From Swiss-Prot:
GO cellular component, one term: Golgi membrane
Name of the protein: Xyloglucan galactosyltransferase XLT2
Residue intervals on the Lumenal side: 71-517
Recorded topology in the membrane: Single-pass type II membrane protein
Keyword Transmembrane included in the entry's annotation: yes
Annotated keywords: Glycoprotein, Glycosyltransferase, Golgi apparatus, Membrane, Signal-anchor, Transferase, Transmembrane, Transmembrane helix
Species, as recorded: Arabidopsis thaliana (Mouse-ear cress)
Similarity comment: Belongs to the glycosyltransferase 47 family.
Amino acid sequence: MLPVSNPSSPEHLLKKSRTPDSTTSIDRKNSFNSLHSVGNRSSYIAASRSHCTWLILSLLSLQLILFLTLRSIPFPHRHIPENFPSPAAVVTTTVTTTVISAASSNPPLSSSSSDERCDSGRVFVYDMPKIFNEVILQQCDNLNPWSSRCDALSNDGFGQEATSLSNVIPKDLVQSWFWTDQFVTEIIFHNRILNHRCRTLDPESATAFYIPFYAGLAVGQYLWSNYAAADRDRHCKMMTQWVKNQPYWNRSNGWDHFITMGRITWDFRRSKDEDWGSNCIYIPGMRNITRLLIERNSWDHFDVGVPYPTGFHPRSDSDVVNWQDFVRNRRRETLFCFAGAPRAGIVNDFRGLLLRHCEESRGKCRTVDCTVGKCSNGSSAILETFLGSDFCLQPRGDSFTRRSIFDCMLAGSIPVFFWRRSAYMQYQWFLPDKPDSYSVFIDRNEVTNGTTSIKEVLERYSKEDVRKMRERVIDLIPNLVYAKSPNGLETFKDAFDVAIDGVFRRFKEQEKWYKWR
């Protein structure tokens, strides 16, 4: 627990004698003067006692008021500073735990209305050394071995405005569309959580503690070329060392802490030095921390899948409603579609099989071949294809999930899955419990061996079935996108809100029945 530095209280109260000092003896020879002297002295004693009593009571009251006032003020915890070297250069960073000042991000302060809206809990954001977030962003030119990431990480992580989509989407929504990179959830979550109405500056009142470390961006620059395992692990080791020195981590052993890791979980699960990725999740200290990832390990309780960022970032509720109306009324002339690229050199490549299957479907399927264009962060061709199709095929990507799942659903197209781990076992906080209410599942093995035709399966759905499923997909849109407004939407809960609510719910449940020690 962070020690509160109470002001020095007085070591002792000011003490006054209850009786006056001894005086000269009374002259007994003059009884009148003697009686008069005694009377004066009695009055003096009574007055002195009264004044002393009021003085003591006043001091006690003042001390009580001062104690109660100062007790409510969070004071920074201080401990022995540690110095961490920057991966880019030898930089000395003094590590101290400080409470973020309200002026730094102007979080909503406590009020009766906000108290009512924060029944689920409050979140405290660690003020970490900048080497864990800001410095990483400042090195955006070096985060990718092939090109600069600066444009992709600009604009609070939303990227450049997608003005070229003006011929595809309603003009009044163009300002809500961006060329958003799929690996920027760390930036988006950090900016939003600093402005969250339930953020607290008092760690004693926190239900959850957020670690604003950009783990995915930090490791991304070391995933390729000839970097050693130590390079890929460096940032995460520094982070866990810092966090484990925080008193609130030590109080719970990390079970009420959470972090956003903006890549798939497998980028942080290296078992051997020669394997891919970092070993961040396996570093001591990470075991009990809840991790928000765009792809989770379905067998790890502490991994939570959150939606990939899409290009749509609504500014208000009206943006959401207008987009829902647009995709609901869109004329769809194609039964199904597929956007992707085959993987050369992979035996029985399923994506290549789907491309061939589409080509053989005689106008029922539309494709976007991503071998000849950039598809990872969306394009007008992909958006138009999804907007014009009833169903969109969603095989696994390089891992079990793809950003395309969310691009597809955002366009009001019904996803068709071939792996249950692509969505059903990934995004339980965001998708309905009944998968068939919004999606179709087809056994990939039956497609591969030719016993099942995708076209025939999808043609069995009536127009009314398709309408109901599409309506369910459209209803989900607010929960799958990240709002542009730093304070979120007015009444809709976006993906960030759903994630934070889930974290609060999980921590309250864990506190009752489940702690790893």
